[in-house]
Amino acid sequence: MSEPRPTAHYHLPGLFEFYDFYRVFLPLFRRHRSYFYDWCDIGSIYGAPADCLWGGGRVGSGTHDPREVLALMQEYDIEARLTFSNSLLRAEHLAEEACSELCRLFAASGGPPNGVIVHSELLLDYLRKTYPSLYFVSSTTKVLTDFALLRRELARPEFRYVVPDFRLNRAFDQLRALPDAYKAKVEFLCNECCWFGCADRRACYEAVSRKNLGEPGPECRCAAPDAAGGYRFSRAMENPGFIGVDAIQNTYLPMGFSNFKIEGRELGSALLLEFLLHYMTKPAYHLHVREEIYLDNMLDLF
């Protein structure tokens, strides 16, 4: 009897930020499943609403009603993850009512299990005690670039998944040597555009955390050689840490890894669509998906 084929679980950006996009894409994904690779699925969608004190990584911009967001996830049996990865939280911030209300809502959903992406140990301890039905993801904002630290994080039972820094994506010898239980917890950040040699990544995340807290502090000025151009998917593909669809299917899945995070909460929905075309859609159906989402014979670009 042949071994079951492994499945890649994608963790997609924009739970709140791209609600309107997913309201169109998810019915398409269900209705025309043959357009998409049968070896992958949507493991979760993550994000945070605007003005979210516990938020981190990016400044949230979503404003849609959380109940409608959760209802959409339940309708399509997809896990929702709250991105609460602020690294600078203090005890007084735990009383923030809007974030607590989100946790109460998502913890009591009764559908697929929902999670929280966290950085702060203080917040992790509080959420574990207060909302035990939620699971937890160790955030890439911890910038785990030392493999020994990654392995230690994977050993922590409180985390269901751990997102290492993208610069460990090609540490193949060490990744291959991980036990299966650890491999199941690794969630690779695939499409990072950050400069591979960046020494300011932690400071950048801390600047975002301060901004979400409404506190003054230095802005993080990107020192990458091509920073002025902003995010370009074509440039991300040239990053030494990039994981593309071929590598997922032919390298990472055979090694025993199955969880892949796509970044992009702060980008536009047109780029999100390009990510989904690259990672999930059979090339023969790229145009079909574009036509279903936005492309018609009256669309003008200029």
Question: Where do the language-model regions lie?
Answer:
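Active-site pocket-lining/capping segments in soluble small-molecule metabolic enzymes
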Residues: 2-149, 153, 159-302
